[in-house]
Amino acid sequence: VTAGANVNDIETVLLLGGRSEIGLEIAVRLAPGRNIVLAARRSGELSEQEQMLKNAGAVDVSTVEFDADAVDTHGDLLGAVVAEHGRISIAVLAFGILGDQARAETDAAHAVAVVHTDYVAQVSILTHLAEIMRGQGTGKIVVFSSVAGVRVRRANYVYGSAKAGLDGFASGLGDALHGSGVQLMLVRPGFVIGKMTEGMSPAPMSSTPSQVADAVVRGLNSGATRVWVPRILQPVFFVMRLLPQTIWRRMPR
């Protein structure tokens, strides 16, 4: 931390998934006047991301080793972040995988791996974070669900089911945190054009990581608990929920 600064006076933003395009776009917007902690595997190879955030005005940028799938390490990881940087003001859960749907339909281990990263690991981190922030009496958590989890489609049901589970867990946790001083914001993006979806045909009403980040920061500033990106997807998926199953099962990704 910058010489002379009190760690308790400077807000700390924890980005879990330190290489995530969306996560980094959010961190860039939150960087001015704050400390940023990037958590990722191979954390020693994040110099480009560190420099980007310093250029954006971060007071300090540090990295920590984070393996989302190693759930038994999550408690110690978060405890170490608090010990070194003080209170976590904002935590952004930006880790996850799409997986290969075709492979997951016949390879049980791959299906389990997708669900473990996209649901089980998130549940672990969220439970630890909620306990820490309850103790602080303040804090904000950003969780990424997806429209894929609002009504699961045949075309991506493994990933979609993990997001459906996460959406339900985060919704319940948000209610449990009501009145605690902790804000949980559940973000439901549609198709996001970026490295994670490279080579895939963009779906209608797609967004960029920058557009998602703008919506997230607006939501954090306004105290929102649900953010759809783009907003039009909320009424669209209200209608989608009502489609007969015979039509729904033929829906593309």
Model-predicted regions and their roles:
Residues G33-E48:
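Conserved glycine-rich Rossmann-like NAD(P)H-binding loop of the short-chain dehydrogenase/reductase
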Residues S146:
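Residue(s) in the substrate-gating loop at a strand-loop-helix junction
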Residues L53-D72:
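Rossmann-fold cofactor-recognition segment
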Residues G96-V112, A155:
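Conserved mid-core segment of classical short-chain dehydrogenase/reductases
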Residues L126, A162:
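Active-site helix of classical SDR
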Residues L186, S201-F238:
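C-terminal helical subdomain
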Residues R19-E21:
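Conserved glycine-rich cofactor-binding loop
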